Swiss-Prot record:
GO annotation, cellular component aspect: cytoplasm
InterPro entries referenced in this protein's UniProt entry, alphabetically: Trp_synth_b_CS (IPR006653), Trp_synth_beta (IPR006654), Trp_synth_beta/beta-like (IPR023026), TrpB-like_PALP (IPR001926), TrpB-like_PALP_sf (IPR036052)
The protein's name: Tryptophan synthase beta chain 2
Oligomer and partners: Tetramer of two alpha and two beta chains.
Function: The beta subunit is responsible for the synthesis of L-tryptophan from indole and L-serine.
Keywords assigned by UniProt, alphabetized: Amino-acid biosynthesis, Aromatic amino acid biosynthesis, Lyase, Pyridoxal phosphate, Tryptophan biosynthesis
Protein family according to the UniProt entry: Belongs to the TrpB family.
Domain of life assignment: Bacteria
Taxonomic lineage: Bacteria, Pseudomonadati, Chlamydiota, Chlamydiia, Chlamydiales
Pfam families, per database record: PALP
Modified residues (N6-(pyridoxal phosphate)lysine): K83
Amino acid sequence: MKHPYPFGGQFMPEILMAPVQDLSNSWKSLQNHSDFKNELDSVLKNYAGRPTPLTEIKNFAKAIHGPRIFLKREDLLHTGAHKINNALGQCLLAKHLGKTRIIAETGAGQHGVATATACGCLGLECVIYMGAKDIERQKPNVDKMNLLGAEVISVNQGAQTLKDAVNEALRDWSKNYESTHYCLGSALGPSPYPEMVRNFQSVISLEVKSQLQEIGFSPDLLIACVGGGSNAIGFFHHFIPDTRVKLVGVEAGGLGIESGHHAARFATGRPGVLHGFYSYLLQDNEGQVLPTHSISAGLDYPAVGPDHAVLYESGRASYTVATDKAALEAFFLLSRLEGIIPALESSHALAELINIAPTLPKESVVVVNLSGRGDKDLEQITNLIKAGNNE
């Protein structure tokens, strides 16, 4: 397919071009600076809890008639998800740039908690924008953000989800950029955000590669859920050059593709511009952004990071979907068989594995990125069970 622009880019209003360019220049000068890298490595190790383990799940593998399966345990990081990798990186960058205030958007609440945590660690003021609908379904994380000293601002415009929270955060940044850094939570937005977030999250694949080598394995298949795409691109990054390793991203199939209630950008979307970048996007024939649905707040976003668009069109990675129902089934299965409660986001990746496991050679090695833990989802799932919607 021919495109009018490369994936990514900087599609921003004039008022935001200055802060975006400033950030881009600062990132170029700091990303390979030894002091910055050493400080980040130290805080990831001594504060966030890296490296995270690689756990083989034999009971789960046996139950689904699968091969050898390992989980990359980002759920065991401080704050319970991969989001802290990026939040600490960006907040440390902001501090080096002399910023005193951090703003962020959040959907599932994990990026909000991670950003509030990083701000607490580094002594920065923190404001979090969150859709009113997401606040309702992610109350535990809202309580955590408040406890950590963040100001949580409810966004009541539009669909009241992640897209609308991003809009409000961008408005804030346009007014306050001299003192404020916008800590974007996924590998999307205007350049340099996708590159920056990928860099901070690539510690995941770096560790997986080393951990598998230590036990004498190389992976045949990597599976990760894809919302904006930061956990997946970080998990894939160091394996992209090795074409023997199959990469699979799993989008939110919601109530099913045919229902129209989903967030499957590659399945039914087409390239367009949203929030400053060009990538695959759910839109109607007039180019208006379509509403999305997922049981998982973290996957409920109408666009996907540009790195994934490149991987999709080149054929280096394949992208599939898991429905709400399939994700719930995977959530319960892992919890009961392994004593590990996954986030609903990560459960989409597990659902895809359950679907394809019988077709995989028994000697193959599969790694699933367990991007977060499911504590934040328990109230929502309990309510679904009470309502009889888990059938």
